[in-house]
Amino acid sequence: MSKDNTINIEREKQLDTVKQKLAPPPMYKVLLNNDDYTPMDFVIEVLVRFFNLDSEKAHQIMLTVHYRGRAVCGVYTAEIAETKVMQVTQYAKKHQHPLMCTMEQV
């Protein structure tokens, strides 16, 4: 094998490694799930507080949760999605609501 071929193979390996390192992180949807007990106003409050939505968008998502059973609140990297789920769950428990927040890979 010539020296040029060896160098080209090494460069290709390095490029493959760089491409793997530069791949975007997996993304996760954060979802709110409907229940029969959590008030609609509380769901809107959660959406505004934890997902930085304006009240109109929060109202639309709340209605989607109510009528379709669940809705996407946002899409984040794994760590941020986990944090959002934890924050919403703790906040709901603190206010004695059974609101469920989950995450799914996109």
From Swiss-Prot:
UniProt-listed SUPFAM superfamilies: ClpS-like
Record InterPro entries: ClpS, ClpS_core, Ribosomal_bL12_C/ClpS-like
GO biological process, one term: protein catabolic process
Cysteine pairs bridged by disulfides in the record: none
Source organism, top-level taxon: Bacteria
Listed PANTHER family: ATP-DEPENDENT CLP PROTEASE ADAPTER PROTEIN CLPS, ATP-DEPENDENT CLP PROTEASE ADAPTER PROTEIN CLPS1, CHLOROPLASTIC
Subunit architecture: Binds to the N-terminal domain of the chaperone ClpA.
Physiological role: Involved in the modulation of the specificity of the ClpAP-mediated ATP-dependent protein degradation.
Family (UniProt): Belongs to the ClpS family.
Protein name (record): ATP-dependent Clp protease adapter protein ClpS
Protein source organism: Pseudoalteromonas atlantica (strain T6c / ATCC BAA-1087)
